[in-house]
């Protein structure tokens, strides 16, 4: 069973690490990400999410991004979900 942490910073870091692994499995990296969509249960946490996002992406050439506040995610303990669309050249 995966332990879920109750803070958005820890969950965001874990999601970005999961995305990084998925990208690497296809010989891609964050420079290949064209779009990120953030689903948060509390949109006021977006500044924390952005700070962590900026550790993974090229902030001079960031992917298109959207953020959506949702009432809840598939697991009651989740605070954030991130959808990443990458383009392989």
Q: Where would I find each of the regions flagged by the language model?
A:
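Short, polar/acidic, helix-capping and beta-turn segments at strand->helix junctions
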Residues: 1-89
């Amino acid at each position: 069973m995966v332990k879920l942490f109750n803070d958005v910073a820890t969950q965001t870091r874990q999601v970005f690490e999961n995305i990084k692994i998925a990208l690497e499995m296809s010989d891609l990296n964050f420079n290949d990400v064209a779009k990120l969509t953030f689903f948060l249960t509390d949109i006021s946490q977006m500044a924390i999410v952005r700070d962590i996002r900026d550790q993974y992406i090229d902030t001079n050439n960031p992917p298109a991004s959207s953020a959506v506040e949702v009432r809840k995610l598939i697991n009651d303990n989740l605070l954030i979900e991130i959808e990443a669309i990458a383009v392989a050249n």
